[in-house]
Amino acid sequence: MRFFFLAFLFVLLFLSEKVQGQAVSWGDQGNGTYINPILNADYSDPDVIRVGDKYYMVCSDFHYIGMPVLESDDMVNWRIISQVYNRFDFPGWDNNENYGGGSWAPAIRFHDGKFWIYFCTPREGLMMSTATDPHGPWTPLHCVKNIGGGEDPCPFWDEDGQAYMGRSQLGAGPIYLHRMTPDGKTL
């Protein structure tokens, strides 16, 4: 029995060395193909738009270092080009009291010559920032509505120019549809 156990441990050790020695290949393969994940990082709740021949992406940022904006020519190779904000100025954000809070499920849009980013925070509400260039600078965060527990904002502008905001509530709550002012600052 002891021999079997030692042999088993030896095989496990040998196999773990084999697995550790193999390179993990992900992203662009250089031959017109790719292997997921294309981004080897935590980019949850992505939202992507195409403007001209470029793609722009934003994702949830559960920490407080600022939401990155990424750019791509092919939706495989991404680079960080700016940050929407540098830090939150809300109480408790600077001492990790709200770890996991941050900005949730952002939406990026291009409308009327401007980039618009909306996201919710767990307690402070629905936030918005704009820029004429995705590389920045981004306007200071504006609280569109203080709705704690809001999630998944989805702004859109109708053909007649009327702006709307669709959103959910924490825990897959009901879906809300709000009229929004044309400047995107008020529901």
Protein language model regions, located:
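Carbohydrate-active catalytic/glycan-binding domains of CAZyme proteins
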Residues: G21-L187
